[in-house]
Amino acid sequence: MKHLYLILLLACALGVNAQQQVLEGDLLFAYSSTTGRAISDATVHDSTALPIYHVAIATWIGDRLYALEAIDEGVVLTPYDKFQERTKNKGGMLIGRLHDRSGVDQSVSNAMEHLGKPYDDLYMIDTQEIYCSELVQLSYVNGKGQRLFPLINMSFHDAKGRILDYWREHYAKHGMAVPEGALGTNPAQIANDPAIEIIKQQ
């Protein structure tokens, strides 16, 4: 029984230590262990070849670490351990860190202003709703207040240029054509940005 207690205590200490290595404003990229039907070439991280489907923002509130993220429930604060467990069940997580951290505090403050907004499952910019990588793109600035991550032309197609059936069906439910080429953002684009260094895979 004593040995079991010591093992549990060590596991807890290791978990806390791992959290302490995460800095304010680090970006948490969730990746899938399988390539789903919604994954296109544009959502793959270049150096790891991992399909990235989500991004969140690490933020410390007191001595507790959270993932600030846009999910189905809207823009919410998720305890880091719950976020980590959720991503682990689907694949894993990459932790990204800005090379230049001079604008981190302002960036996180900007993101917190979106807390409570509804989720945008159509991935359109300039609406009151917001999706995961849009939260990062809108919020992250350098020390001069300039946005770090540009908008890109969104891609919903496979390597052969064919729009994936998943996205055709998804937008058809809303009476829309797939917005191929429209301005937007995605998690892999941010993970691949030269402003970011991937420091850890979990």
Residue ranges and their predicted role:
Residues H3-A13:
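Sec-dependent N-terminal signal peptides
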Residues V16-Q19:
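Boundary at the C-terminal end of the N-terminal hydrophobic targeting segment
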Residues E24-D26:
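Loop/turn positions that initiate beta-strands
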Residues A30-R97, Y119-T127:
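Glycine-rich catalytic cores of cysteine/serine-nucleophile enzymes that process amide/ester linkages
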Residues Y53, V104-V108, M112, S133, ...:
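Extracytoplasmic/secreted envelope proteins and their assembly/folding machinery
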Residues I61, R101-S102, G143-K144:
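A short, structured loop/turn motif at beta-sheet edges
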Residues T87-N89, R97-G116:
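A structural motif
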Residues Y123-Q202:
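Activation targets extended, charge/polar-rich intrinsically disordered C-terminal tails
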